[in-house]
């Protein structure tokens, strides 16, 4: 039985996907994709599923997501799901389709929050006193 493990990251959210032979079920934190709320997040998560089409009919994907907020978790999940579908099927045309639609379906967003600097640490990394000219 073929099993593929992939990872998607966005800020502090990490999604780990496991794809194996099955009947086309997708579960996120043991909850079916169809039951995800709010609707905006469900629709964003459906994008790789809709693009894959019939290629997804014999794949089961289980995704565990931790850290971050709702939107970061959604982006990390999309990336992990997209990578899992492409890696499991091994189809280059599917990879090209994903990349032309939205690059973040296969490539994690590398941006992270900037560390706070020592001077005004609680206020943020670039906080300065407001300058007064008179």
Curated annotation (Swiss-Prot):
Q: Give the record's keywords alphabetically.
A: Ribonucleoprotein, Ribosomal protein
Q: Which gene encodes it?
A: rps9
The cross-references to HAMAP family, in alphabetical order and at most eight, read: Ribosomal_uS9_A
Where is this chain compositionally biased, Basic residues type? 118-134
Q: Which cysteines are joined by disulfide bonds?
A: none
Q: What PROSITE patterns does this protein's entry cite?
A: RIBOSOMAL_S9
Question: What domain of life does the UniProt record list for this protein's source?
Answer: Archaea
- The molecule here is called Small ribosomal subunit protein uS9
Q: Which GO terms describe its biological process?
A: maturation of SSU-rRNA from tricistronic rRNA transcript (SSU-rRNA, 5.8S rRNA, LSU-rRNA); translation
Ranges where the record places region Disordered:
109-134
Q: Name one GO molecular function term.
A: RNA binding
User: Which Pfam family is one of this chain's hits?
Assistant: Ribosomal_S9
Q: Which family does it belong to?
A: Belongs to the universal ribosomal protein uS9 family.
Name the GO cellular-component terms: cytosolic small ribosomal subunit
What organism is recorded for this protein?
Methanococcus maripaludis (strain C5 / ATCC BAA-1333)
């Amino acid at each position: 039985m073929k099993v593929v493990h992939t990872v998607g990251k966005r800020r502090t959210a990490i999604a780990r996907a496991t794809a194996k032979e099955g009947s086309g079920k997708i579960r996120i934190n043991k909850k079916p994709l169809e039951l995800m709320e709010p609707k905006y997040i469900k629709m964003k998560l459906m994008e790789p599923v809709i693009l894959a089409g019939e290629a997804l009919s014999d794949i089961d994907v289980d995704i565990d997501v931790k850290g971050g907020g709702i939107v970061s978790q959604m982006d990390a999940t999309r990336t992990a799901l997209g990578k899992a579908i492409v890696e499991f099927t091994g189809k280059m045309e599917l990879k090209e389709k994903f990349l032309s639609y939205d690059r973040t379906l296969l490539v994690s967003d590398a941006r992270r929050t900037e560390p706070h600097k020592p001077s005004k640490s609680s206020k943020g990394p670039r906080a300065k006193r407001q300058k007064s000219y008179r």
